[in-house]
């Protein structure tokens, strides 16, 4: 059956459903009402080899902020659910993704300790109708709710679409690396302490 997470999140602003399978093949069915976000989520599924289903309705007649953030929250929660106690995973992941002139580095740790260090310099304020300041908000929401330590670095790039897409591709590959099972660890917790904080807990 594989490692799976399913979240249904309802607020006064949005309703979001997320299902993720970590041991998938990259199947993706996404409809958030935010076209550019949908495009990026397809990159996440395809390059991470995650099976991903996301549906969202929200107050996009105002702007995309609430939907973007709540999709990130629900995705992070689903990811944390699928990882459970993180037993047997590699835990760390790192990837540098090029897209034409853009080059973005992502390093992450499924540590249970949320932190985001983000240094994308996206020239355009919007890509299509998508406000580029929402890119950071999305990753902060995912990391906080999945318990990820996440570092995102732009090494090169001038085209806004290329920079953001390279970021999502690098995140996908780093997350795939970190969440895959390490056959040498078998069922062990990947920590010298013998425990990792699960998403939503503190310690």
Swiss-Prot record:
Record-level GO cellular component terms: cytoplasm
GO molecular function, one term: imidazoleglycerol-phosphate dehydratase activity
Superkingdom in the source lineage: Bacteria
Pathway(s) the chain acts in: Amino-acid biosynthesis; L-histidine biosynthesis; L-histidine from 5-phospho-alpha-D-ribose 1-diphosphate: step 6/9
SUPFAM superfamilies for this protein: Ribosomal protein S5 domain 2-like
Any GO BP annotation: L-histidine biosynthetic process
Cross-referenced CDD domains: IGPD
EC number: 4.2.1.19
Signal peptide: none
Reaction catalysis annotation: D-erythro-1-(imidazol-4-yl)glycerol 3-phosphate = 3-(imidazol-4-yl)-2-oxopropyl phosphate + H2O
Coiled-coil segments on the chain, per record: none
InterPro entries according to UniProt: IGPD_sf (IPR038494), ImidazoleglycerolP_deHydtase (IPR000807), ImidazoleglycerP_deHydtase_CS (IPR020565), Ribosomal_Su5_D2-typ_SF (IPR020568)
Gene3D superfamilies cross-referenced by the UniProt entry: Imidazole glycerol phosphate dehydratase, domain 1
Subcellular location: Cytoplasm
Keywords annotated in UniProt: Amino-acid biosynthesis, Cytoplasm, Histidine biosynthesis, Lyase
Similarity annotation: Belongs to the imidazoleglycerol-phosphate dehydratase family.
PANTHER family cross-referenced by the UniProt entry: IMIDAZOLEGLYCEROL-PHOSPHATE DEHYDRATASE, IMIDAZOLEGLYCEROL-PHOSPHATE DEHYDRATASE HIS7
NCBIfam families: PRK00951.1-3 (NF002108), PRK00951.1-5 (NF002109), PRK00951.2-1 (NF002111), PRK00951.2-4 (NF002114)
Protein name: Imidazoleglycerol-phosphate dehydratase
């Amino acid at each position: 059956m594989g490692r799976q997470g399913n979240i249904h999140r309802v607020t006064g602003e949005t309703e979001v459903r997320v299902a993720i399978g970590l041991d998938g093949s990259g199947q993706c069915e996404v409809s958030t009402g935010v076209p550019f976000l949908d495009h990026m989520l397809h990159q996440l599924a395809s390059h991470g080899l995650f099976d991903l289903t996301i549906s969202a309705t929200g107050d996009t007649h105002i702007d995309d902020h609430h939907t973007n953030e709540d999709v990130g929250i629900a995705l992070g929660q689903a990811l944390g659910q699928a990882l459970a106690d993180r037993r047997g995973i590699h835990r760390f992941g790192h990837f540098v993704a090029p897209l034409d002139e853009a080059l973005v580095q992502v390093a992450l740790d499924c540590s249970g300790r949320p932190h985001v260090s983000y240094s994308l310099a996206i020239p355009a304020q919007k890509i299509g109708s998508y406000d580029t300041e929402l890119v950071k908000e999305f990753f902060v929401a995912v990391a906080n709710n999945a318990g990820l330590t996440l570092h995102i670095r732009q090494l090169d790039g001038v085209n806004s679409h290329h920079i953001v897409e390279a970021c999502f591709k690098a995140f996908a590959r780093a997350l795939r690396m970190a969440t895959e099972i390490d056959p040498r660890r078998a069922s062990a917790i990947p920590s010298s302490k013998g425990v990792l904080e699960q998403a939503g807990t503190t310690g």
